[in-house]
Protein backbone atom coordinates (compact mmCIF):
# COMPACT_ATOMS: atom_id res chain seq x y z
CA UNK A 1 0.00 0.00 0.00
CA UNK A 2 1.39 3.33 -1.10
CA UNK A 3 -0.48 6.30 0.37
CA UNK A 4 1.58 8.93 -1.51
CA UNK A 5 1.73 7.20 -4.89
CA UNK A 6 3.09 10.09 -6.93
CA UNK A 7 4.21 9.26 -10.46
CA UNK A 8 3.93 5.47 -10.22
CA UNK A 9 7.40 4.15 -9.44
CA UNK A 10 6.16 1.80 -6.72
CA UNK A 11 3.31 0.61 -8.96
CA UNK A 12 5.83 -0.29 -11.66
CA UNK A 13 8.04 -2.08 -9.11
CA UNK A 14 5.06 -4.07 -7.78
CA UNK A 15 4.08 -5.01 -11.34
CA UNK A 16 7.64 -6.02 -12.24
CA UNK A 17 7.62 -8.40 -9.27
CA UNK A 18 4.05 -9.58 -9.93
CA UNK A 19 3.01 -8.62 -6.40
CA UNK A 20 -0.64 -9.76 -6.27
CA UNK A 21 -2.10 -6.32 -5.50
CA UNK A 22 -0.84 -2.74 -5.35
CA UNK A 23 -3.03 -0.13 -3.67
CA UNK A 24 -1.99 3.41 -4.48
CA UNK A 25 -3.48 6.56 -3.05
CA UNK A 26 -2.80 9.84 -4.81
CA UNK A 27 -4.26 13.29 -4.22
CA UNK A 28 -3.44 14.57 -7.72
CA UNK A 29 -6.52 13.75 -9.82
CA UNK A 30 -4.64 14.86 -12.95
CA UNK A 31 -2.71 11.59 -12.74
CA UNK A 32 -5.81 9.42 -13.11
CA UNK A 33 -5.61 9.09 -16.88
CA UNK A 34 -1.80 8.56 -16.93
CA UNK A 35 -2.23 5.80 -14.31
CA UNK A 36 -4.89 4.16 -16.48
CA UNK A 37 -2.42 4.16 -19.38
CA UNK A 38 0.37 2.87 -17.13
CA UNK A 39 -1.83 0.05 -15.83
CA UNK A 40 -2.82 -0.94 -19.37
CA UNK A 41 0.83 -0.88 -20.47
CA UNK A 42 1.90 -3.08 -17.55
CA UNK A 43 -0.93 -5.56 -18.19
CA UNK A 44 0.10 -5.66 -21.85
CA UNK A 45 3.63 -6.54 -20.70
CA UNK A 46 2.25 -9.51 -18.77
CA UNK A 47 2.04 -8.41 -15.16
CA UNK A 48 -0.50 -10.18 -13.00
CA UNK A 49 -0.53 -7.37 -10.42
CA UNK A 50 -3.91 -5.80 -9.74
CA UNK A 51 -3.34 -2.04 -9.58
CA UNK A 52 -5.97 -0.37 -7.41
CA UNK A 53 -5.57 3.40 -7.59
CA UNK A 54 -7.61 5.73 -5.40
CA UNK A 55 -7.49 9.40 -6.25
CA UNK A 56 -8.21 11.13 -2.98
CA UNK A 57 -6.55 12.80 -0.03
CA UNK A 58 -4.72 10.08 1.91
CA UNK A 59 -6.03 11.56 5.16
CA UNK A 60 -9.62 10.77 4.11
CA UNK A 61 -9.13 7.06 3.33
CA UNK A 62 -10.73 4.50 5.64
CA UNK A 63 -7.71 2.22 6.03
CA UNK A 64 -9.71 -0.27 8.10
CA UNK A 65 -11.38 -1.38 4.85
CA UNK A 66 -8.05 -2.29 3.23
CA UNK A 67 -6.00 -5.40 3.83
CA UNK A 68 -2.28 -4.78 3.55
CA UNK A 69 0.89 -6.28 4.97
CA UNK A 70 3.27 -3.76 3.43
CA UNK A 71 3.40 0.00 3.32
CA UNK A 72 6.06 1.47 1.06
CA UNK A 73 5.87 5.15 0.25
CA UNK A 74 7.73 8.42 -0.08
CA UNK A 75 5.90 11.36 1.45
CA UNK A 76 6.36 15.05 0.63
CA UNK A 77 9.43 16.52 2.33
CA UNK A 78 7.85 19.42 4.18
CA UNK A 79 7.88 22.34 1.76
CA UNK A 80 10.71 21.20 -0.50
CA UNK A 81 8.35 19.51 -2.93
CA UNK A 82 5.11 21.08 -4.12
CA UNK A 83 2.39 18.76 -5.37
CA UNK A 84 -0.84 19.62 -7.09
CA UNK A 85 -3.89 19.57 -4.78
CA UNK A 86 -1.78 19.35 -1.59
CA UNK A 87 -2.84 21.87 0.99
CA UNK A 88 -0.47 24.51 2.26
CA UNK A 89 0.49 24.53 5.92
CA UNK A 90 0.65 28.18 6.95
CA UNK A 91 1.77 27.20 10.47
CA UNK A 92 5.00 25.70 9.16
CA UNK A 93 6.54 22.35 9.94
CA UNK A 94 4.80 21.87 13.29
CA UNK A 95 1.41 22.27 11.63
CA UNK A 96 2.37 19.83 8.89
CA UNK A 97 3.62 17.36 11.51
CA UNK A 98 0.40 17.61 13.52
CA UNK A 99 -2.09 17.74 10.64
CA UNK A 100 -0.44 15.60 7.98
CA UNK A 101 2.39 13.29 9.01
CA UNK A 102 1.21 12.22 12.47
CA UNK A 103 -2.41 11.40 11.62
CA UNK A 104 -1.44 9.75 8.32
CA UNK A 105 1.32 7.59 9.79
CA UNK A 106 -0.89 6.70 12.77
CA UNK A 107 -3.85 5.63 10.58
CA UNK A 108 -1.81 3.65 8.08
CA UNK A 109 0.31 1.88 10.71
CA UNK A 110 -2.72 1.04 12.85
CA UNK A 111 -4.30 -1.02 10.07
CA UNK A 112 -1.09 -2.67 8.83
CA UNK A 113 -1.41 -6.41 9.36
CA UNK A 114 0.55 -7.89 12.25
CA UNK A 115 3.92 -9.12 10.98
CA UNK A 116 3.81 -6.57 8.15
CA UNK A 117 6.44 -4.03 7.17
CA UNK A 118 6.06 -0.25 7.25
CA UNK A 119 8.62 1.39 4.98
CA UNK A 120 9.02 5.14 4.61
CA UNK A 121 11.36 7.16 2.44
CA UNK A 122 11.35 10.41 4.43
CA UNK A 123 14.01 12.96 5.20
CA UNK A 124 15.88 12.72 8.48
CA UNK A 125 13.99 15.66 9.96
CA UNK A 126 10.60 13.97 9.48
CA UNK A 127 12.04 10.75 10.89
CA UNK A 128 13.35 12.50 14.00
CA UNK A 129 10.41 14.89 14.55
CA UNK A 130 7.55 12.48 13.79
CA UNK A 131 8.44 8.85 13.15
CA UNK A 132 10.45 8.09 16.28
CA UNK A 133 7.68 9.51 18.49
CA UNK A 134 4.94 7.51 16.75
CA UNK A 135 6.66 4.32 15.65
CA UNK A 136 9.85 4.14 17.70
CA UNK A 137 13.27 3.80 16.14
CA UNK A 138 13.25 1.99 12.81
CA UNK A 139 14.21 -1.69 12.82
CA UNK A 140 16.33 -1.15 9.71
CA UNK A 141 17.65 1.93 7.91
CA UNK A 142 18.95 1.88 4.34
CA UNK A 143 20.61 4.60 2.30
CA UNK A 144 18.82 5.55 -0.89
CA UNK A 145 21.00 7.50 -3.27
CA UNK A 146 18.72 8.91 -5.93
CA UNK A 147 21.23 10.21 -8.43
CA UNK A 148 24.93 10.37 -9.10
CA UNK A 149 24.55 14.04 -10.03
CA UNK A 150 23.76 14.92 -6.42
CA UNK A 151 27.20 13.81 -5.18
CA UNK A 152 27.00 13.25 -1.42
CA UNK A 153 23.25 13.79 -1.06
CA UNK A 154 21.43 10.67 0.05
CA UNK A 155 18.10 9.90 1.58
CA UNK A 156 17.17 7.17 3.97
CA UNK A 157 14.56 4.45 3.83
CA UNK A 158 13.26 3.50 7.27
CA UNK A 159 11.74 0.08 7.95
CA UNK A 160 9.56 -1.00 10.88
CA UNK A 161 8.22 -4.51 11.48
CA UNK A 162 4.85 -4.67 13.20
Give the ranges of each region predicted by the language model.
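Class I S-adenosyl-L-methionine-dependent methyltransferase catalytic core
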Residues: 1-162
Amino acid sequence: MDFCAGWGGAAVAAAALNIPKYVGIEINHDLKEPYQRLSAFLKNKGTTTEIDMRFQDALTVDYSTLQYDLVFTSTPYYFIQKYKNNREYEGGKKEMDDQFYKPLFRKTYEHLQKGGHYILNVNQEVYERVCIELLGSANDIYTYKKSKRQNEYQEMVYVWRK
